[in-house]
Structures are given as structure tokens and as C-alpha cells.
Amino acid sequence: QAIIKLAKAYGLDDPKIAPHVPMDPNLKLKKGEGNEIIPEAECSYAAMVGSLLYLSLTCRPDIAAAVGVLSRFMSCPTAEHVDAARRVISYTYTTRELGIVHRRDGVNNPVLAFCNHEDSLELSRQQEPDLMTSYADADLAGDISTRRSTTSVCVLLNGGLVAWISRLQPTVALSTTEAETIATTDCVKLLMHLRLLLRELGREQQQPTIVYEDNQAAVKLTAMPEQSKRAKHYQMKVHFLKGMVKNGVYRYIWISTHDQ
């Protein structure tokens, strides 16, 4: 109902062209300057983004990345920003029947999407119900204004998302390995909270939670016994991750970028 109400408020409940993705991946938004900036009274940009932010935090993780980008321009929106926000609203309306599905068999394994039915059934039997898995990723210097990277995290339980993160990293990462390490740190901190929550609910995780990561250097970094010279400036995060691996909180599994 919230999606329908939002779309009707901005005349987007019957779009002529339904977008397949929330935001054009080739779109690079930047802060408006001077006469480019549109007053809030004329465009209601903050109101649109605020409504989308609510949806992205509660039930629509698929728009989290797009809304995160839009929220960076609340004080200086241009016509381009308004069009991008309207596109996200249009997307949420045309995909309003989509939802998060949790399965009783507890399958989180991405391999199941790339095998035949018999293999899928066999792998399903190997999965334990109520076992979390997660994905961590980052785009290096994705923000063109600050050159900061964006952390992306997804946590699945019984085949459906239960938690997600899409936010700008607080510092500028100097390499993909550093950006991915920062993202994994955020992921593991979230996993620590969720593991404690599941324990209180009587669903304690008996195994380390899998973190799928597509950067081989970041995966190898936590397995190195010695200190990496290239990672001296973020060694605290590396040692934190090493400690969490040792304590059985999580374990890395490399996955291809295509599957990530």
C-alpha cells in the first residue's frame, strides 16, 4: 500500500515505460550548483527520497543502492536527480508484487542456481535450516565527488534476505582490496549481531557464517600469518577479521564477480 500511495502521489502509478532496474548503472550523479539547484518546494525531492528510504530499509533491499546515491544530494537536487528519484518510484510500483521468500529447506547456496534439478535436490539436502550466509562487496571510488567506495552487504537466512547494507564508506580506499576489506568488516559486525539475536531466539549458529567475497586478495589477506606491507594503514580491520575467523564467527569463500 505504501508503494501504491507513493506512486499515485507523484503520478507514477501508470508509467508508460517500466524500468527494469532502479537506476541506470551508467548514470553518474553529481552535486548541483547555482541555478541548477531546484528548491524543495518545487520538486519535493527530499520527500521522495525520504519515502524511498523507508521502503529500502524495510521491505525493498533491491532499491537500497539507488536510494543511497540519491540521498547524497538532498540539499542540492537538480532536474537529473529528480528524474532519477522518479525512476526509482516507477520501478518500485511496477515491481510491487515482488517479495522476499524464506524457504523451509534453508537453502542459501548460490550454486543451486547453476545446476540441474537432481543436483539441486541433493545440495538442498546438505543445507541446514536456519543457517545464515552472506555476501560482501564494494565499488572502488564509486562516488565521483569524494572518490569514496560504497559498501554492499546481504545476509540470507533460509533463502531470503534478513539484513542488508548499502552505504558510503567513511574513508577513501586506495585499492580494491582495502575497499573490500572495509566492506567485509561491516558485514562481519552485522553477522555478530545477528548470530547473538538468533541464539536468543533458540537458533544458535553451530557453524561459522559464510561470507562470499569476489576479491581474492582480500580473502588471502586474512589467511596471511605475517603483516602485509600494503595493508599497514588498515591493519586494525585485518586483525579484527583474522580474530573473527579464528573465533569461528565467519569464514571466507571466494566467488566469481559474475555470481556475486
Regions from the language model: what does each represent?
Residues 1-260:
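Long, low-complexity, charge-biased intrinsically disordered regions
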